[in-house]
From Swiss-Prot:
Disruption phenotype: Reduces the chitin content by about 10%. Does not affect conidiation nor nuclear distribution, but leads to increased hyphal hydrophobicity and to reduced virulence on tomato plants. Strongly increases sentivity to the detergent SDS. Disulfide bonds: none annotated. It is a multi-pass membrane protein. This is Chitin synthase 2. Polymerizes chitin, a structural polymer of the cell wall and septum, by transferring the sugar moiety of UDP-GlcNAc to the non-reducing end of the growing chitin polymer. Plays a critical role in cell wall integrity and virulence. The chain crosses the membrane at residues 708-728, 747-767, 785-805, 820-840, 860-880, 889-909, 987-1007, 1020-1040. It comes from the Eukaryota. InterPro entries: Chitin_synth (IPR004835), Chitin_synth_fun (IPR004834), Chitin_synth_N (IPR013616). It is an enzyme of class 2 (transferase). It is found in: Cell membrane. The gene is chs2. One of its GO terms (biological process) is chitin biosynthetic process.
Length: 1083
C-alpha cells in the first residue's frame, strides 16, 4: 500500500518522476509523512481542469515527459543552510490533531482566491509552486493563518531560497479584472469567480470614454473624451487594507523561531505587494522544460492596469468640449453663411422673441479684402429680408487685447446712450424704435490676440459662439469672421446682466473678428469700406475699448451734424479716469495727464473749433459724416489718403508719411477740411464727454507719447507743406483767412516744440543762475552757486543719458533708469520754480531797486507767470471747471521737464519705429478647420484628424529623403524698411541735436547768468509765451461768446426786451441784423 501511495503521489506531482523519485523516497523512509486519501484524486482533478499547451520562453523548472531521463532540473542547486527535519511527528501537528479530535479548531476558513501565476526573472533559482483549484477541501496546516492547502500533505521538499517572491495573499473582496490569465481556465463557472458588487466609495468609471458619475455634473454632460478615466481601485472592497509599498521586490523571511519543526510553515513577507502574475499552466505542462516568457508577457499586457499618472494641468471633471458633427450646408452666393440658434438660457429671459434677429446668431466667413465686401455679394442683416432698415448712426468700437472689464465698460455705456436715443419720443428721427437706426460694429484686431474673457462677454450677450468659425471655405482663406445678432442684454463693468428692466433696449451688433493682426488702420478699413459701404450710414462714431462715453454724449455728437450741414467731423472732451473719489490722482503721472487733458479741452480745442480746423479728432471719441469721407470720381479723397499708410513697404515708403500714420486720427482731419470743392469744417462739442484710462506706469506712458508726438509733429509738417490745398476748396474768404491764421499759429508752435529742449535748458540756466549773485543768494556763503553748478552738470549729463537710453533701450527694459531721470528732472524743476518766486519776492522787498513796470526783471517774470498760471486759472473758472488746477497743476509743472526732455528725446530717437508695438500676423492658421465641398454645398469638417498629421509627417520624410534644397530668400521688405528708417532717424536726430546745441551755447555765451535784465533772448522768450497764451484765450473766449449767441438765436434763451413805442420797428431791425450776423459766422 505504501508503494501504491507513492506511485499515485509521483503520478500526480508536477515534478519529473525520474529526477526526484530517489530523493523523495529517502526522505519518506526517514520521516514518513501521512498522506490524505484524497490527495491523488485532487491532483488528478486539477490536471484535468488546466489546459495543456506549450509556451515558449526562458529557462525554469517544468514537468517533463516521462520517457526523458537526462534533463537538467532547475531546483537542483538548493541552499545548503536548510533547516533539518526533526524525527517523528511534530508538536504542532500533534496539538492540531488533538484539537480536531475534540472539535476545538476555531481557525476560520479563508475563501478561495482566483488562480494566479508567479513571475520571477531568476526563475531557475526558485522552487516551482503548485496551486490547487478553488473550493477543494484540504486539511489545514497546524496553526496556519490561512486555509488548508495541498502543501500540508505534500512530499517532504526543501523550502525555497530567500530571494523567492511570494504571492501576495488577498481577500475575496478584491474585484476580478476584466481579463486575467485565470480567466483562461475553463470549467470555472462558480459564483466565487464573479466580480463582487461595487463598493460604496465613489470613483471614476472604468469605461474608456468616461461614463457619467452619479451626483456630479458629468451625469448631465458625460465624461471628458479627451482623457481616459482610471478604473475603480483594485482593493476598494477588501476587508484588510493593503499597506503601500516602496519597491516591487519582496523579501521572504522564514519564521524558523516559531515553526522550526515545520518545513512547509508559512512565510512572512515584508511587503504585501501583489507580484507579477505567472501562467500556472507552465508548471503543469509535461511537454517542454522551457517556459515561454514572451507568451507570458503577451498575456500580461492584456491585463488592465492603472497606467502612468497624467502630467500637466487636467480638465475639471464633469466638463467636456462640445461634440462636433459633420453637416452639409448650402452656400449663399458662394459664401459660407450660417444661422445659429442662440443658447437656451439666453432665449429663456428675452422679452422679444418674434424675429430671427433675436433668436438666431448669423455667422459669415469673409474670404475677400474689405474693399471687395459688397462686390463679392456679402450682405448684412440690415440689407435684406424683414430687417431691411436705414442706418442713421454707425458706431465702431476697435479693440486689440483688452480684457472684459474695459470692453464691458465701453459697451454698457454705448447701450445706455442708445436707450437715450429711444427715450426722445418727440424727435422726428428717434423714438421708441430708434434702436433700429443704430448699428454697433466691434472690430477685433487678430483672432489670437483677443482676450478670452472678452469673447466670453460677447458670448454671454449672444453675439459670439465658439466652434463654428472656419479657417477656409473651398480652399479660400478666411480674412474675417463676422457675427451678427440683435442683443437685448448688457453687461456692466461689474459683469452683471442688465436688461429691459434697467431700460436697456435692443442693440444691433456686428462683431468682426479679424483672422490676422493687421493694426488699427486695417480695422477702420473694415469698418468704412466693408460694413459702411453696405449700410451707407449718415454719421459714423469711432470709439476705443476702454472709453466710457457719458449718458448723452453720442446724442450730442450726432446733434452737431444734424444742426450744421457743413460739419464733417466732431469730437468731444476726453477725460482721464480718476477712479473712485479721485484715488488715481494720487499717482503724479495720472494727475499730470489729467491737467494736460483739461487744459487742452479748455484752450486748444475751442480755439481750433473757432477756426474750423481741429488738428486732431481723438480716435477714442470722435464722429465723421460718412458722405464727407467718400472719394471723388478719380478715387482721390479722405479715405484713400487715410488708408494709404497701410500699403507702405520697404524703402519706397515715406518716413514722414509713415510716422504721420501713427496718429491716424490727424489724417482725416486735414483731408476733410482741405477736400477739393467742399467747405467741410470740424467742430468741438463741449457737451460730449468720455472717460478713458491713461497710462499709470512710466514705460507705457513713454510708448504712448512716442506715437502721439511723432504723429503730431509729422502731421503738422504735412499740413503746413500742403497748405495750398485750402485755396482749391469752397470755403468762404473769411474762413480761408482764419485757416491761414491757424497755420501761422501752428508754425510757431512747431518751432517752439522743435527747440523746446534748448529753451528748457536756457530757462533753467538763467533763472537758477540768477541766485548765484551774492546779493540775491538766499542761503549765503555761495551755497546757491554750488547748487547751481551741481544741477547744471546733472542736467547736461541727464540729457545726454536720455539720448543713449532712447537709441538703445526700450522703456520696458529700462524702467528704473527712466524713473530716476524723471525724478532728477523734477528736482531741477522744483529748484527753478523756487528761484523764480524768490527773485520776484526779492524785487518786491528790496530797498535798493525801485519797483517799476518796464524793461526789467520784475516785469518779465510777472508777465511770464501771469500769462501761464494766471491764464490757466482764469479760463478754468470761465468754463466752470477749475478743480484740476487744485488737484493736478502742481504735478504737471513738476513733471514738465520730463515731458520736454524724456518724451521728446525718445520720440525723435525712434522715428524709425512706425509700429504700434505689435507685429503683423501673416501666418495662415488652420486650427479651426474648413468648409470643403463641391458646387453650392460644403461639408464642415472637424479639426485636424490623425490622417492629416500622418500626411504632413510623410511629406517631411520625403523632403529629407530627396534632399530638397531650400532657396535663399532675399532681404525682406521689413528689413529694408528698418534700414531706411534708421538712416533717416540718424540725420534727423543729428540736425535736431546740433540745432539745439548751437542755440543753447550761443545764447549762454552772449549773456551771462547774472545779467537777467539785459538778456534780450529771455525777454523775447517770456513775451512770446505770454502772447501765445493771450491768443489762445481770445480764441476760447470767442468760442464761448458764439455759443451764447447760438443759444439765443435758437431760442433756448428767451429775452423779453420791450422797446418804447416811439422807437417804432427798431426791435425788428435789430433782430434781423443779429440773424444775418449769425448766418455769416456759420458760413
Amino acid at each position: 500500500m505504501s508503494s501504491e501511495r507513492e506511485e499515485r503521489t509521483f503520478r500526480s506531482s508536477p515534478v519529473q518522476q525520474d529526477d526526484v523519485r530517489e530523493n523523495i523516497s529517502n526522505e519518506n523512509q526517514e520521516h514518513p509523512s501521512p498522506n490524505p486519501p484524497s490527495y491523488a484524486s485532487s491532483m488528478a482533478e486539477s490536471q484535468t481542469l488546466l489546459p495543456k499547451r506549450p509556451i515558449i520562453g526562458g529557462q525554469t523548472a517544468k514537468l517533463q515527459n516521462k520517457n526523458r531521463t537526462s534533463v537538467h532540473v532547475a531546483f537542483a542547486d538548493l541552499p545548503r543552510d536548510l533547516p533539518e527535519i526533526p524525527d517523528g511527528i511534530s508538536d504542532r501537528r500533534r496539538v492540531h490533531k488533538e484539537q480536531q479530535h475534540l472539535g476545538l479548531d476555531t481557525t476560520p476558513p479563508v475563501p478561495p482566491r482566483p488562480l494566479s501565476r508567479l513571475r520571477d526573472v531568476n526563475s531557475h533559482d526558485k522552487l516551482p509552486s503548485i496551486r490547487s483549484p478553488r473550493n477543494l477541501n484540504y486539511q489545514p496546516s497546524v496553526r496556519s493563518s490561512r486555509s488548508g492547502s495541498i502543501f500540508d500533505d505534500a512530499p517532504s521538499m526543501a523550502p525555497p531560497g530567500g530571494s523567492y517572491v511570494s504571492y501576495g495573499m488577498h481577500d475575496d473582496g478584491s474585484p476580478q479584472r476584466p481579463w486575467t490569465p485565470s480567466s483562461r481556465v475553463s470549467g470555472f463557472t462558480r459564483s466565487d469567480l464573479s466580480r463582487p458588487p461595487p463598493s460604496d466609495g465613489m470613483y471614476e468609471p472604468s469605461d474608456l470614454n468616461g461614463s457619467p458619475r452619479p451626483g456630479t455634473p458629468s451625469s448631465r454632460y458625460g465624461g471628458s473624451p479627451r482623457r481616459p478615466l482610471p478604473p475603480a481601485p483594485l482593493f476598494s472592497n477588501s476587508r484588510q487594507p493593503v499597506p503601500p509599498i516602496a519597491d516591487d521586490a519582496t523579501i521572504s523571511i522564514p519564521l524558523h523561531d516559531t515553526y522550526d519543526d515545520d518545513v512547509f510553515a508559512p512565510e512572512s513577507d515584508l511587503s504585501d505587494a501583489r507580484p507579477h502574475p505567472v501562467d500556472r499552466s507552465s508548471y503543469m505542462s509535461s511537454e517542454s522544460q522551457d517556459t515561454l516568457n514572451e507568451g507570458d508577457m503577451e498575456d500580461y499586457d492584456k491585463v488592465e492596469h492603472y497606467g502612468p499618472a497624467p502630467t500637466g494641468a487636467q480638465e475639471r471633471r464633469g466638463v467636456r468640449a462640445p461634440q462636433m458633427s459633420r453637416k452639409e450646408v448650402q452656400l449663399i452666393n458662394g459664401e459660407l453663411v450660417l444661422e445659429c440658434k442662440i443658447p437656451t438660457i439666453l432665449y429663456s429671459f428675452l422679452p422679444r422673441r418674434g424675429e430671427v434677429e433675436f433668436t438666431h446668431m448669423r455667422y459669415t466667413a469673409v474670404t475677400c479684402d474689405p474693399d471687395d465686401f459688397v462686390e463679392r455679394g456679402y450682405t448684412l442683416r440690415q440689407t435684406f429680408g424683414k430687417t431691411v432698415r436705414e442706418t442713421e448712426l454707425f458706431i465702431c468700437v476697435t479693440m486689440y487685447n483688452e480684457d472684459e472689464i474695459g470692453f464691458t465698460r465701453t459697451m454698457h455705456a454705448v447701450m445706455k446712450n442708445i436707450s437715450h436715443f429711444c427715450s426722445r419720443s418727440r424727435s422726428r428721427t428717434w423714438g421708441e424704435t430708434g434702436w433700429q437706426k443704430i448699428v454697433v460694429c466691434i472690430v477685433s484686431d487678430g483672432r489670437e490676440k483677443i482676450h478670452p474673457r472678452t469673447l466670453d462677454a460677447l458670448a454671454a450677450m449672444g453675439v459670439y459662439q465658439h466652434g463654428i468659425a472656419k479657417n477656409f471655405v473651398n480652399n479660400r482663406a478666411v480674412q474675417a469672421h463676422v457675427y451678427e445678432y440683435t442683443t437685448q442684454v448688457s453687461l456692466d463693468s461689474d459683469l452683471k446682466f442688465k436688461g429691459a428692466e434697467k431700460g436697456i433696449v435692443p442693440c444691433q451688433m456686428i462683431f468682426c473678428l479679424k483672422e490676422k493682426n493687421q493694426r488699427k488702420l486695417n480695422s477702420h478699413r473694415w469698418f468704412f469700406n466693408a460694413f459702411g459701404k453696405a449700410l451707407n450710414p449718415n454719421v459714423c462714431i469711432l470709439l476705443d475699448v476702454g472709453t466710457r462715453p457719458s449718458g448723452t454724449s453720442l446724442y450730442h455728437l450726432w446733434k452737431a451734424f444734424d444742426t450744421d450741414s457743413n460739419v464733417a467731423g466732431a469730437c468731444g472732451e476726453i477725460k482721464a479716469m480718476k477712479g473712485r473719489l479721485g484715488a488715481n490722482l494720487l499717482n503724479p503721472l495720472v494727475a499730470s495727464q489729467n491737467f494736460e487733458y483739461k487744459m487742452s479741452n479748455i484752450l486748444d480745442k475751442p480755439l481750433e473749433s473757432v477756426f474750423g480746423y481741429i488738428t486732431v479728432l481723438p480716435g477714442a471719441l470722435s464722429a465723421y459724416r460718412y458722405h464727407a469721407l467718400q472719394n471723388d470720381e478719380t478715387g482721390h479723397g479722405p479715405l484713400s489718403q487715410y488708408f494709404k499708410g497701410e500699403t507702405l513697404h520697404g524703402q519706397h515708403a515715406d518716413v514722414f508719411t509713415a510716422n504721420m500714420y501713427l496718429a491716424e486720427d490727424r489724417i482725416l482731419c486735414w483731408e476733410l477740411v482741405a477736400k477739393r470743392g467742399e467747405r467741410w469744417v470740424l467742430k468741438y462739442v463741449k457737451g460730449c464727454t468720455g472717460e478713458t484710462d491713461v497710462p499709470d506706469t512710466v514705460p507705457e506712458f513713454i510708448s504712448q507719447r512716442r506715437r502721439w508726438l511723432n504723429g503730431a509733429f509729422f502731421a503738422a509738417v504735412y499740413s503746413l507743406v500742403h497748405f495750398k490745398q485750402i485755396w482749391f476748396t469752397d470755403h468762404t474768404l473769411a474762413r480761408k483767412i482764419l485757416l491761414h491764421m491757424e497755420f501761422l499759429y501752428q508754425f510757431i508752435q512747431l518751432m517752439f516744440t522743435f527747440f523746446s529742449l534748448a529753451n528748457f535748458y536756457l530757462t533753467f540756466y538763467f533763472v537758477a543762475g540768477g541766485l548765484t549773485d551774492p546779493k540775491v543768494d538766499p542761503f549765503g556763503h555761495n551755497i546757491a552757486t554750488v547748487i547751481f553748478h551741481i544741477l547744471r552738470y546733472a542736467c547736461v549729463l541727464l540729457i545726454s543719458t536720455q539720448f543713449i537710453l532712447s537709441l538703445g533701450n526700450r522703456p520696458q527694459g529700462s524702467k528704473k533708469l527712466y524713473l530716476i531721470s524723471m525724478i532728477i528732472y523734477s528736482i531741477i524743476m522744483v529748484y527753478t520754480t523756487f528761484a523764480t518766486f524768490y527773485i520776484i519776492i526779492h524785487q518786491l522787498t528790496s530797498k535798493d531797486d525801485k519797483i517799476e513796470m518796464g524793461d526789467n526783471v520784475f516785469t518779465n517774470m510777472i508777465v511770464s507767470i501771469l500769462s501761464t498760471i494766471g491764464m490757466y486759472f482764469i479760463m478754468s473758472i470761465l468754463y466752470l471747471d477749475p478743480w484740476h488746477m487744485i488737484t493736478s497743476s502742481a504735478q504737471y509743472f513738476i513733471l514738465l521737464p520730463s515731458y520736454i526732455c524724456t518724451l521728446q528725446v525718445y520720440a525723435f530717437c525712434n522715428t524709425h519705429d512706425v509700429t504700434w508695438g505689435t507685429k503683423g500676423d501673416n501666418v495662415m492658421k488652420t486650427d479651426l478647420g474648413g468648409a470643403v465641398g463641391k458646387g453650392e454645398t460644403v461639408e464642415l469638417e472637424m479639426p485636424s484628424e490623425q490622417l492629416d498629421i500622418d500626411s504632413g509627417y510623410d511629406e517631411a520624410l520625403r523632403n529629407l529623403r530627396d534632399r530638397l534644397e531650400v532657396p535663399e530668400s532675399p532681404p525682406s521688405e521689413s528689413q529694408l524698411q528698418e534700414d531706411y528708417y534708421k538712416s533717416v532717424r540718424t540725420y534727423l536726430v543729428l540736425t535736431w541735436m546740433i540745432g539745439n546745441g548751437i542755440l543753447g551755447m550761443a545764447v549762454s555765451e552772449i549773456y551771462s547768468a547774472r545779467g537777467i535784465g539785459d538778456n534780450y533772448y529771455l525777454r523775447f522768450l517770456l513775451w512770446s509765451v505770454a502772447a501765445l497764451a493771450v491768443f489762445r484765450a481770445i480764441g476760447s473766449t470767442t468760442f464761448a461768446v458764439l455759443n451764447v449767441i447760438n443759444m439765443i438765436v435758437e431760442g433756448r434763451v428767451r429775452l423779453s426786451l420791450k422797446a418804447p413805442r416811439w422807437m417804432g420797428g427798431l426791435k425788428e431791425r435789430v433782430n434781423d441784423k443779429m440773424s444775418s450776423v449769425s448766418s455769416n459766422l456759420r458760413s
